[in-house]
């Protein structure tokens, strides 16, 4: 069927900010879909609140609205734009839920907007647990016995009839939020109570646990003519019971017989046909390893994290084709863009193995609950491709960037057998490493399979890796063993460790004996047809398929897996850099390991290498491609850390040079540079041990800010107010970087702001100054940022511009740099300089209309700012006000404290723009789902040093009609200043403490600040946790509360007698 001509204008809903469970894969899907629809000649209108994505660039759709994805704003845009149709299946759970809400409120009918791709009934059937159960029974597809409950008591009664363990799954939540496995009634009560609160329809499904079955996923496509096919099947290394987003996954599935594959394939295809889904769909199944019994676990009637993985694993662009199917095209009419010759009706065939390993945020959250279950906790993932399981698994391990270069963590050798086996049985994020250690200790694959229900096939592969380790140890310098090790994915560094030599010597030995990798193409058809995609992976074998072209090339290093502190913003910069390289007439080559992002879409660059970002893997590509140079400043800390080893190996680093990167990163050199340039910074010292730190702090005076040098995202950074806390910090955090000392700085409580600058070595362009709403001490990535600045005087802005120019020229910056300042009493201090693109690049690029990463790349390749038409200095500011606000994923991470400080905790961001500060703030709060009603109660629990300031806020809340509650000390302070607050009890005062008021819905907002003694704050932590679990807005910085007050004041009426 040809494409539809009765619709012209289509609206696409994006997925909003990045949170755990909904990450960059939707930026990739949405970008592909919008371009795919434009290619067919439709007018595309996009709504998405996330400025950090490629998807919200002007070129992606005909009209891009960066507005909150809420009923209020989406309805406004629908009324204004009047599209013919709406495509909701590319915006993750956010997009689906929005479509449901628009439909239930009658907006779609009123405006005559048709839903494309997936019918509402199908969304309902797949998402509503009851309807899903009915449909499966009709299709005679087996599902675990289950019951829908709306109260805790119903749950307990049902569990009594089927027996424990049971699984709780709340309806309409994302990434398993609020669900979990329960081994007894106590756990069931706890999890169900929480799950009912988090489900928008207060219902949960209680089902028999089938933990221990194999978890298999099928990614399927269907069109309007009922053609359906399987794009890819995938098998989880971890059995059922661990969320698939937190599992190690292999594609294609490895341990199923042909019969089992056909059985599950038929089930998946019959389900997508019954749901009449037009587009992509993901079916998760559980297979009993000991019989041919299986269960259907769930169906996602949309593009998902698994479909991004399947697209990258097979090269088959699911989202692009889903968009074409949505407008009526069929699979036998669309050409597969990978081969350029076969139709999309061909099922992909793979002649390689793909491994995906999740990346978790626990390096940032040491207190976080690391046990894995049905609720997702990973922030991102890596993927690696190899010719065997060992190779793809080991390549994926070294892509993770958690300080490992093999499937082993050396410290585990010291763990006792009992502790080891406990970690093998009770899965945490690092279980793979514990299982590998158990094998090294001589536990047999059979024993481990019995304990973990991991298939023995995979455990044999781990045993094979260990056998090769032993061979290497027994035969140093042996070329045959070296070849075997390389064929199985071993890194030079691991081989060097076992041989007692250096990585460099192993590399030399390889090169002398021509043991080098070849690069194979990902072509969807197992090399059956010629393919035109330049998408490659390395392996040790015959025939290299990546042919170097005659054109001069430039290699751009990506930023690896998404984690806190290094998010999709860096991928954005990478993609823009590639566009500029191509525009300058070079061949652009990308190297990256993240399957979720736009940069690893094969149509973005001239060549894509899907490889770990390590020195060895990057050098192999450089040896083959011989590029003009490498650009490292867009890949975050990942790429910057590779600059020095690459330069030592004689590689040309384009842009700011290594010596100058060092001057910005190394503390002593940086201080010296600032002295020479006559720029003030807060007084500080370096310390290598506890005593030196204590001395430094006494000399500078408390409070001090302590942190290791060379880190991203404020890892292990703290504000310390007394010597006792300082000593405990030195004992726990110095491990963060043994070679690099700890920095001790005077902590200046002032107004913080930051600047991104672009320099060609002569002139410096400053697109804008962003002012932080939270005062210094909250990490810049967790602060709300406002552009243009609202409170900085002209003199301060001129000083900032002047210091920025001096620094850019003085540090020989070529390309991008980011500088953070703190201002106190009109005096400007420099806090830090990052000689690379920062996480504010996408936001600033969008609000100033300067494509910053592209401009920077053009400068790196030799053009000047004046040639590109930009002036020296601060760019004229916009008339509208734009706010970048952080979004957190605390609901997903038990035991992580939500108190904001110098260590970054947010996973994503949203943007609010309008004519005034108050309106822009309102949009930013709405977009980040911090909704405050216009009346209700606010509770204050404030540290002594902030009580004065809080009193003023409390008065203003009272003036607009809010009720004020406060904890004992705070209430007494308010009363002595003539403000009556209703006191609330201490934690543990049943029914009178804050958590119980929160549970009863009597509190609309909590304002909680923490004083100098961090140790005595367990109460505060419980209060903050209760706010997060019940979705009550929580402010741990008075400045954010003040911003929210401005919004409420601008929206409220004051009643006064005359």
Swiss-Prot record:
UniProt-annotated binding residues for Mn(2+) 1: 284, 298
UniProt: Mg(2+) 2 binding residues: 298, 300
GO molecular function: ATP binding; carbamoyl-phosphate synthase (ammonia) activity; carbamoyl-phosphate synthase (glutamine-hydrolyzing) activity; metal ion binding
GO cellular component assignments: cytoplasm
Segments of this protein annotated with the region Allosteric domain: 930-1058
Protein residues bound to Mg(2+) 4: 832, 834
Binding, Mn(2+) 2: 298, 300
Region (Carboxyphosphate synthetic domain): 1-401
Pathway(s) where this gene product acts: Amino-acid biosynthesis; L-arginine biosynthesis; carbamoyl phosphate from bicarbonate: step 1/1; Pyrimidine metabolism; UMP biosynthesis via de novo pathway; (S)-dihydroorotate from bicarbonate: step 1/3
Cofactor: Mg(2+); Mn(2+)
Catalysed transformations (reactions): hydrogencarbonate + L-glutamine + 2 ATP + H2O = carbamoyl phosphate + L-glutamate + 2 ADP + phosphate + 2 H(+)
Positions that bind ATP 1: 129, 169, 175-176, 208, 210, 215, 241-243, 284, 298
Domain (ATP-grasp) ranges: 133-327, 671-861
Stored PANTHER family: CARBAMOYL-PHOSPHATE SYNTHASE [AMMONIA], MITOCHONDRIAL, CARBAMOYLTRANSFERASE FAMILY MEMBER
Family affiliation: Belongs to the CarB family.
Subunit-level organization: Composed of two chains; the small (or glutamine) chain promotes the hydrolysis of glutamine to ammonia, which is used by the large (or ammonia) chain to synthesize carbamoyl phosphate. Tetramer of heterodimers (alpha,beta)4.
The name this protein goes by in its record: Carbamoyl phosphate synthase large chain
Organism name: Streptococcus pneumoniae (strain JJA)
């Amino acid at each position: 069927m040809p494409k539809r001509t009765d619709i012209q204008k289509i609206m696409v809903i994006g997925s909003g900010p990045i949170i755990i469970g909904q990450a960059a894969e939707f930026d990739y899907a949405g970008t592909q879909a919008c371009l795919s629809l434009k290619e067919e000649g439709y007018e595309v209108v996009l709504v998405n609140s996330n400025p950090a994505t490629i998807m919200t660039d002007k070129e992606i759709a005909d009209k891009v609205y960066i507005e909150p994805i809420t009923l209020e704003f989406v309805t406004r845009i629908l009324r204004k734009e009047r599209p013919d149709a709406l495509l909701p299946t590319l915006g993750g759970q956010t997009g689906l839920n929005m479509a449901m809400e628009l439909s239930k409120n009658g907006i779609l009918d009123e405006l005559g907007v048709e839903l494309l791709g997936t019918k509402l009934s199908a969304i309902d059937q797949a998402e509503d647990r009851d309807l899903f159960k009915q449909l499966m029974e009709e299709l005679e597809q087996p599902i675990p016995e289950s019951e829908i409950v709306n109260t805790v008591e119903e749950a307990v009664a049902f569990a009594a009839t089927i027996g424990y363990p049971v699984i709780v799954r709340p309806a309409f939540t994302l990434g398993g939020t609020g669900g979990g496995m329960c081994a007894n009634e106590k756990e069931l009560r706890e999890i169900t109570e929480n799950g009912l609160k988090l489900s928008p329809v207060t219902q949960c499904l209680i089902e028999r646990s089938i933990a221990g079955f194999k978890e298999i996923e099928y990614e399927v496509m269907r069109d309007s003519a009922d053609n359906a096919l399987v794009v890819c099947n995938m098998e989880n290394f971890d059995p059922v019971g661990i969320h698939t987003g937190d599992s190690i996954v292999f594609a294609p599935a490895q341990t199923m017989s042909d019969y089992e594959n056909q059985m599950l394939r038929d089930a998946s295809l019959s389900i997508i046909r019954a749901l009449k889904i037009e587009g992509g769909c993901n079916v998760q199944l559980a297979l009993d390893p000991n019989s041919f019994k299986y269960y259907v676990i769930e169906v996602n009637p949309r593009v998902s994290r698994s479909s991004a993985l399947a697209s990258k694993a097979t090269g088959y662009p699911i989202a692009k084709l889903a968009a074409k199917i949505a407008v009526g095209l069929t699979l036998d009419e669309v050409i597969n863009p990978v081969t350029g010759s076969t139709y999309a009706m061909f099922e992909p065939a793979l002649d390689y193995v793909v491994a995906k390993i999740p990346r978790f945020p626990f390096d940032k959250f040491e207190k976080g609950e690391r046990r894995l279950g049905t609720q997702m906790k990973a922030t991102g993932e890596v993927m690696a491709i190899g010719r065997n399981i060992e190779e793809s698994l080991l390549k994926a391990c070294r892509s993770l960037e958690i300080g490992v270069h093999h499937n082993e963590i050396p410290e585990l050798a010291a763990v006792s057998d009992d502790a080891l086996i406990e970690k093998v049985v009770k899965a945490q994020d690092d279980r793979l490493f514990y299982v590998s250690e158990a094998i090294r200790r001589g536990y047999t694959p059979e024993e481990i399979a019995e304990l973990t229900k991991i298939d023995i096939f995979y455990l044999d592969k781990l045993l094979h890796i260990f056998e090769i380790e032993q061979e290497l140890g027994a035969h140093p310098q042996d070329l045959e063993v070296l070849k075997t090790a390389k064929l199985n994915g071993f890194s030079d560094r691991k081989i060097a460790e076992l041989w007692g030599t250096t990585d460099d010597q192993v590399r030399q030995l390889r090169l002398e004996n021509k043991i080098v990798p070849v690069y194979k193409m990902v072509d969807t058809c197992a090399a059956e047809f010629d393919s035109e995609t330049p998408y490659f992976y390395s392996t040790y074998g015959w025939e290299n398929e990546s042919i170097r072209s005659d054109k001069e090339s430039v290699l751009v290093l990506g930023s690896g897996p998404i984690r806190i502190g290094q998010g999709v913003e860096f991928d954005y910069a990478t993609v823009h850099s590639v566009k500029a390289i191509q525009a300058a007439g070079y061949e652009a080559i990308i190297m990256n390991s993240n399957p979720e992002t736009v940069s690893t879409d094969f149509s973005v660059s001239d060549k894509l290498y899907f490889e770990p970002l390590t020195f060895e893997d990057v050098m192999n590509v450089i040896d083959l491609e011989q590029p003009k140079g490498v650009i490292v400043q867009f890949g975050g800390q990942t790429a910057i850390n590779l600059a020095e080893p690459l330069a030592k190996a004689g590689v040309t680093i384009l842009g700011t040079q290594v010596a100058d990167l060092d001057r910005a990163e190394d503390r002593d050199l940086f201080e010296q540079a600032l002295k020479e340039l006559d720029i003030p910074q807060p007084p500080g010292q370096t310390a290598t041990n506890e005593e030196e730190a204590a001395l430094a702090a006494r000399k500078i005076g408390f409070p001090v800010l302590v942190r290791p040098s060379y880190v991203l995202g404020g890892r292990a950074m703290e504000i310390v107010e007394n010597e006792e806390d300082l000593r405990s910090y030195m004992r726990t955090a110095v491990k963060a970087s043994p070679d690099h000392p700890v920095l001790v700085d005077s902590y200046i409580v002032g107004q913080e702001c930051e600047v991104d600058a672009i320099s060609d070595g002569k002139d410096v362009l400053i697109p804008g100054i962003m002012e932080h709403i939270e005062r210094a001490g909250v990490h810049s990535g967790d602060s709300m940022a406002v552009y243009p600045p609202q409170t900085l005087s002209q003199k301060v802005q001129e000083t900032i511009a002047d210091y920025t120019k001096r620094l850019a020229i003085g540090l020989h910056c070529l390309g991008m740099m980011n500088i953070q300042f703190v201002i106190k009493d009109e005096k400007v201090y420099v806090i830090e300089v990052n000689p690379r693109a920062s996480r504010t690049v996408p936001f600033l690029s969008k609000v100033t209309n300067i494509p910053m990463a592209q401009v920077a790349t053009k400068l790196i390749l030799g053009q000047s700012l004046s040639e590109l038409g930009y002036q020296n200095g601060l760019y004229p500011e916009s008339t509208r006000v734009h706010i970048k606000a952080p979004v957190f994923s605390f609901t997903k991470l038990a035991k992580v404290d939500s108190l904001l400080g110098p260590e970054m905790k947010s996973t994503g961001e949203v943007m609010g723009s309008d004519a005034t500060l108050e309106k822009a703030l309102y949009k930013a709060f709405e977009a980040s789902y911090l909704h405050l009603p216009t009346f209700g109660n606010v509770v204050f629990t404030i540290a002594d040093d902030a009580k004065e300031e809080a009193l003023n806020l409390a008065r203003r809340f009272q003036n607009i009609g809010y009720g004020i509650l406060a904890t004992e000390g705070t209430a007494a302070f308010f009363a002595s200043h003539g403000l009556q607050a209703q006191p609330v009890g201490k934690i543990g005062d049943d029914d009178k403490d804050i958590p119980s008021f929160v549970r009863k819905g009597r509190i609309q907002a909590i304002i909680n600040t923490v004083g100098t003694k961090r140790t005595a704050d367990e109460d505060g932590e419980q209060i903050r946790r209760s706010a997060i679990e019940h979705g009550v807005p929580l402010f741990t910085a008075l400045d954010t509360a003040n911003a929210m007050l401005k919004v409420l004041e601008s929206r409220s009426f004051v009643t006064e007698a005359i």
